């Protein structure tokens, strides 16, 4: 247990994790309570040591294609919830093919096909399966799907047509908070979908939000909850209030920062993929997240893309700086580099 550990003893924490130590709940309370700059820097350093032990200076790159921003859900935190009166789009199959052409040879390890729970695809799930097949045939890369809570039959068909990874975020394992965030949606349904996907050979990603009313105990509950389906990727994202949503005016005063939780995730899941998203703070934010222990850059947009991200800190900026060339340039400055495709597929194992 590390609850009484002095600051200088944090330096050995990474070594303990590499040797097989598993954090206790009291350990998690100690780490999540850290506030001093020195304490946090030592936590980040321990997380980097663990990451570097398993992955070296290699980083994975994930292209994000948000192909439909229509959604039937009323998530209180999400800009794209069905009650928000915003401009939306749904790419045609031809537009998706054209997007794929811009990605060939660009250096991405995986393509993330994301949509809201769009009635167009939910009324005829074979449309979604066809989309997966087209992208697989065009690019031949591993495909992550983020379609919301699809039925098992559709998940199985998508797997057969080339989907490798299912991203389906719980947001929180605090059931009371969940009801406030994913309004009217089944808690168990999402857990069961990930479990089914894992059984069918998918890799799975789970994720939580922070800064949305979670405290240390509910965060521990969520961290433990993410372990239940043996996820291949674990994510935390900071809640960013979105215009036109029920939580537009919400402000959280906790000290449970995304960077702190990324480091804790690395210590809990030493061999897993942990994202450094561009969605909240762009390239500069990517650097901070990699320095906290992340090892895959997500929300990289296709070249010259006008597609949306999820939180879109840069929605109104002319220069979005979220392309793969910009990412690679910054990685090189950091002394890091894109991994080989074979490295990524070895990590996937699925």
UniProtKB/Swiss-Prot annotation:
* One GO-annotated biological process of the protein: pyrrolysine biosynthetic process
Q: Which UniProt key words apply to this protein?
A: 4Fe-4S, Amino-acid biosynthesis, Iron, Iron-sulfur, Isomerase, Metal-binding, S-adenosyl-L-methionine
Cofactor comment in the record? Binds 1 [4Fe-4S] cluster. The cluster is coordinated with 3 cysteines and an exchangeable S-adenosyl-L-methionine.
Q: Which SMART domains does the UniProt entry name for this protein?
A: Elp3
**Residues annotated for (3R)-3-methyl-D-ornithine binding in this entry:** 112, 146, 169, 235, 277, 298-299
Listed binding positions for [4Fe-4S] cluster are 71, 75, 78
Q: Which GO terms describe its molecular function?
A: 4 iron, 4 sulfur cluster binding; intramolecular transferase activity; metal ion binding; transferase activity
Described by its record, this protein's role is as follows: Catalyzes the isomerization of L-lysine to (3R)-3-methyl-D-ornithine via a radical-based mechanism, a step in the biosynthesis pathway of pyrrolysine. Also catalyzes the reverse reaction in vitro, converting (3R)-3-methyl-D-ornithine into L-lysine.
Q: Which family does it belong to?
A: Belongs to the radical SAM superfamily. PylB family.
Protein's name according to its UniProt entry: 3-methylornithine synthase
Which classification does the entry list for the species?
Archaea, Methanobacteriati, Methanobacteriota, Stenosarchaea group, Methanomicrobia
């Amino acid at each position: 247990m590390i609850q009484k550990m002095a600051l200088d003893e944090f330096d050995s924490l990474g070594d303990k994790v590499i040797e097989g130590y598993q954090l206790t709940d009291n350990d998690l309370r100690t780490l999540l309570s850290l506030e001093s700059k020195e304490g946090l820097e030592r936590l980040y350093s321990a997380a980097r040591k663990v990451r570097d032990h398993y992955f070296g200076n290699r980083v994975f790159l994930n292209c994000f294609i948000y192909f439909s921003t229509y959604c039937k859900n009323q998530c209180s935190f999400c800009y794209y919830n069905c009650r928000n009166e915003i401009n939306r789009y749904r790419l045609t199959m031809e537009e998706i093919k054209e997007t794929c052409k811009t990605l060939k040879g660009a250096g991405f390890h995986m393509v993330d096909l994301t949509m809201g729970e769009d009635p167009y695809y939910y009324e005829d799930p074979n449309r979604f399966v066809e989309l997966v097949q087209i992208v697989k045939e065009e690019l031949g890369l591993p495909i992550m799907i983020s379609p919301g809570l699809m039925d098992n039959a559709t998940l199985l068909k998508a797997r057969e047509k080339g989907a490798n990874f299912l991203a389906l975020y719980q947001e929180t394992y605090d059931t009371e908070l969940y009801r406030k965030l994913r309004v009217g949606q089944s808690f168990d349904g999402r857990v069961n979908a990930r479990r089914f996907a894992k059984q069918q050979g998918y890799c799975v990603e789970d994720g939580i939000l922070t800064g949305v009313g979670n405290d240390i105990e509910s965060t521990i509950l969520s961290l433990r909850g993410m372990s239940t389906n043996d996820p291949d990727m674990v994510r935390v994202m900071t809640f960013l209030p979105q215009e036109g949503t029920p939580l537009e005016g919400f402000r959280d005063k906790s000290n449970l920062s995304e960077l702190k939780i990324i480091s804790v995730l690395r210590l809990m899941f030493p061999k897993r993929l942990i994202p450094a998203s561009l969605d909240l703070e762009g390239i500069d934010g990517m650097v901070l997240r990699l320095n906290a222990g992340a090892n895959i850059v997500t929300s990289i947009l296709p070249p010259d893309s006008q597609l949306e991200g999820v939180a879109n800190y840069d929605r109104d900026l002319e220069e979005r700086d979220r392309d793969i060339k910009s990412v690679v340039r910054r990685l090189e400055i950091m002394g890091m580099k894109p991994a080989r495709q074979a490295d990524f597929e070895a990590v996937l194992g699925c």
